Amino acid sequence: MTLRARPHLHYAPVSEGVYFNGPRTQFVISGPQLLYRVADTCVPLLEAGTTEDELVTALGSERARPVVRRIVDELRARDLLLDLGALTVPEPSAEIRARYPEALAHLETECADPYAVFQRLRTTEVLLCGPADVLLPAARGLHRAGVTGLTLATPDFDAAAATTSRLGLRLLPLSDSASLPDPGDLPVPPDAALYCPGADAGVTPEALTALLPEGALLVPVRWDGLVAAVGPAAPARASLPGSAALIGRAARWAAADAAAPAPHPTAEALAGALAGQLLFDTLAGIAQPGEAHVLHGEELTADQVSLVAPGTASGEAAERRFLTAAPAAGAEPVPPPTPDEAVEAVTALTGRWTGPLALLGGEELPQMPLALRETADRDGGAGSVVAWAEEQRTATVAVALTALRAACPTPGAAAAGLTEEHWLLDGALRLMADEAVPYATRAVGAVEARSEPLLRMLEEEGMPDPALTLLRHPGLDWTLAEVRTSGGPRPWTGRSWGRDDTEAVHGALATALARHQTHGVPGAGPLADGVHTDALLFADASAQAALRKQIADAAAAAGLRYEGTPRRPDPVTGALPLWSGGVRAVPLDGEPQAAEESAEETAHG
């Protein structure tokens, strides 16, 4: 069998043997110093294409065969060799290779059957629609890569004429008022399209699908005053909504960052080149699913982003979820994520350009005795919010959940959680807080050691001896604590659930103090109104299961159950890694109860 090394295979001697490096892997084959001499003979021959027998012959001894076989086996195991005999299409001629060296090297690096892919791309028909500043760089790149079946439809006929004539491309003139050609004007049916709507961003997927076969690939290029978005590459019904959502989200990020606009016409040229490369890679089957690019800044930076579910329809119906005493029969229990997993989920929500939330630096927010974190909305909603925790990692998770609650539509209690169970429990606790009954009212008095710094800070700020009310819901063994301060710049209130009195009091004290500290920072967002439920973050699976049963049993005794409607998938990133949405109490026959957590709950400072 004839083997050829994929491009970009490098090797070097190391003390343990020979180091090899490929596009996506690196490893060491251990052995004596002589092993490098063997590799130094074999690798150049493999780059040209050779057989095992020819490698052994080049080394001059049959005794070298085991070593040759070992090197070959290690390279094949890491997909660094092509078996030319197993390919469905033979390698192209020397003339074709000389004409398209970069494209062939790219396909040989990435594809299992590179020459079959290249042959298919050579016969692909691509329609490019939009301004010449965008289309010409894309057309040149695609033509240079071997995709020569190109039709350009542009209102800039004169600007495109010389290039299209030189490259032998088809050119269709568009009027200034048209962004798409008439289907009858196309000389050949396109297999894929690149579309830059320019000022006309209102073209529907239906209009584009009239030009393209069912499921044909589309790469959009969109502009905003500050940024440009390239991609995602997908059928028009997904790609157009996905790109519209991406450019809107990226524009809000750029505006919030006070970014300078991308320079023209350089930005158009780069956007076109990136769009052409994305179209080529997607047709070849080597682009990452949902790959897109955002161009921004005076220095014109292009950031690659990923759209997990391009163009997810915002109108998709969300399936209602119910908090039952136990998971449904056969349902796999979902353990709470680890702290690192929770932070990773928040990171997915706050990625620049694509995330609906932005984690702010918070340099002005106090960090003692509590850690305070702030997030800003990047989804067209209102402002920013702050949350507290004992340390930064938990505060990062807490503020993301707070922001998701702030974005919840009515009706119901706005709730969020790390899992479906956590989200429903969060909503139920918020609703049940209004039903909790006081059983003790006093000054806070003595507290556990971790709460003492909170009391000292309140006293230093002129708010000593806050009043405490302890409450219980008849069906729960959790405690609800309410702390009210007096003195200072204004009174503050903190309400918090806890697994016991101590935890609830600590949460209420911390909430009241965090309200005071946040209020003193100019420009900072507010601490969210409502009851603090972050004790759920520290409740393990068994504690959550016990609470779930208590809540479900208490609701059933009242002829109710708790129902949640999860947030729909995000139009940019797809399904969110955290749960959120409205939770409400409904009668067991399914009709919502009139009494829900008030949207106008009394502000707590």
Predicted regions and their residues:
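N-terminal glycine-rich dinucleotide-binding loop that anchors FAD/FMN and/or NAD(P) in oxidoreductases
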Residues: T164-L180
